[in-house]
Each structure stands twice: as C-alpha cells, then as structure tokens.
C-alpha cells in the first residue's frame, strides 16, 4: 500500500480510539486514587479493612444493646455457638459477659463507640490480621485484633497503633 492509495480517514474510528484511551486512563487513575485513598484514610489498600471495621462496629453495637449472646457470636465468629457450647469451654459466655461489663477494658459497660482507624498487621501481602482502633464511652481508646484466618476478634490487640 502506498500513500496514493491509503485508506480513507475514518473519523468515527479515531473518535472511538480516543474515547477508549481516555476511559482507560480514567479507570487507572480512579484505581490509583482508591488504592492510595484507602491507605491514607487508614482503612487499608483499596479499603480492604472495611469488613473487619464493620465487624468490630457490630460487636460494639451488640454490647451497647446488652445483647451479649450476639456479641459473643461475633467475637468468636460462631453464630451457632449455642448449638455447641463445649467448643467455647475455655472462654464461656459467662466469663465473656463479665469481661465486657464490669471488667471491660474501660472498666464499665460499653455505651458508645466510634471506629477510627485500622491497620493490617502480620506477615503476607494483607497480613495475618487487622488492628482496629476504636474510641468507646467517649474518649477511651481500645484496640481490637481481627484474625483473618478464622474471623475471630481478640482484645487486646498484639500491640497498639503508634501515632493514634
């Protein structure tokens, strides 16, 4: 093919190519923004820690409502724990209730909470767990550990978040 018999200029094809390039650039830009935004906001890359934050928030909401059975189910990640209480003989519901009322980490029943920030911790790409920082009963800081492998919660977390 020579310049003298080149195909005719197709305006629609060029417009489509330009639109696809702009769209691809916008998607890549949005992905970068979401990735960095989640990390900077303290919710993990691409907001990957949000499920753990929601679980901790649900746990505290159950404690505020004095629904200790539901809170225990969330804490142990075992919604059917009443079917097999022998699995939790090392940490039964009675001890759990005492630990989260009169002997709670804030030395009082939980009446309010706010999830502030979370950080991935441990080995691997997304870590073995997540430390979720919350303020309970006003301004008391509490750090909960969310174990990725089994979905259980633990208090206290292995360590506190620095700079929080």
Positions of predicted regions on the chain:
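Short solvent-exposed beta->alpha transition segments
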Residues: 58, 69-135
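Prokaryotic Sec-type signal peptides and long signal-anchor helices
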Residues: 63-64, 100, 130, 147
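Broad hydrophobic/π-residue packing in well-ordered secondary structure
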Residues: 59-63, 74, 140, 152-154
């Amino acid at each position: 093919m020579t310049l003298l018999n080149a195909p005719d200029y197709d305006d629609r094809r060029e417009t489509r190519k330009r639109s696809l390039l702009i769209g691809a650039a916008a998607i890549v830009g949005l992905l970068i923004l979401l990735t960095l935004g989640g990390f900077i906001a303290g919710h993990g890359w691409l907001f990957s820690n949000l499920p753990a934050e929601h679980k901790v928030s649900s746990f505290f909401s159950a404690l505020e409502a004095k629904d200790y059975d539901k809170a225990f189910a969330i804490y142990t990640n075992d919604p059917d724990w009443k079917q097999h209480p022998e699995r939790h003989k090392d940490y039964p519901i009675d001890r759990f209730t005492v630990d989260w009322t009169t002997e709670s980490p804030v030395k009082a029943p939980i009446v309010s909470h706010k999830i502030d920030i979370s950080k991935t911790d441990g080995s691997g790409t997304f870590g073995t767990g997540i430390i979720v920082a919350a303020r309970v009963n006003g301004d008391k800081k509490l750090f909960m550990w969310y174990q990725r492998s089994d979905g259980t919660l633990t208090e206290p977390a292995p360590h506190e978040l620095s700079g929080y």
